[in-house]
């Protein structure tokens, strides 16, 4: 989903927090809904969205098409546009906070953000967050270099596979697909997907495990460089994650998402980001 793959920068938690706390607040208010990529907000006591009438969205700015830095240097993406549309429906303001993905739980629990909205997989995390209803179908997939003879999972035996730290793909390969991962020479993790795909293109690794949207974006950008294996690692759903117990905010967002589907806004946004591999067919909340 988007060019800010630092969604889960592979740095220590203390470093992640220092980075986030040191950056300036980007306020979106009722305007265009896009903050400057030059900085991020300082942590502060943020109430739930429904109570404060403000969405403070934590997102990974290198995760196209859901959240990334546009050509104009402004934050953009499907989920950010969707968050702005929801805020408008509810009469809320919206702030965008580009975060280190490793620090998302600390930032949410501290109140520096009041939701995580950026291609956020809900399966396996239900005990840790209060979620909106799921809105988008997603898959975890494997991407390899084109024309190197890797056509199936079996061909990855003895190969080096890389994924993003604390990603859904890592969870799958360390959980339901751990037997597959055991056949790899190594399963490496890295802070952001842009670098992972650079390593794949250079031959430093043999495959990248990632969200379908990331794969589609990379394949669209470099169709002669990469190929996606046919068999997905898993299927899952995206939802908006709130601090555990913030049911009021989650319900309000779900209500607005359904309304945005009904009035055609969701279809328009899916079409806007179609070139990034996003499909209206994957929308599930109706």
Q: Would you name each region that the model predicts?
A:
Residues 84, 93-155:
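Acidic, polar ligand-binding/catalytic clefts
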Residues 103-106, 119-128, 172-175, 201-235:
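A ligand-binding cleft/hinge motif common to bilobed small-molecule-binding domains
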Residues 25-40:
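Bacterial lipoprotein signal-peptidase II cleavage site
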Residues 61-64, 75-88, 120, 141-194, ...:
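Bilobed "Venus flytrap"/periplasmic-binding protein-like clamshell domains
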Residues 2-18:
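N-terminal secretory signal peptides and thylakoid transit peptides that target proteins
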Residues 80, 96-106, 187-198, 236:
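Short helix-initiation/N-cap motifs at beta->coil->alpha
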Residues 29, 80-89, 159, 165-168, ...:
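Extended ligand-binding regions for polar small-molecule ligands
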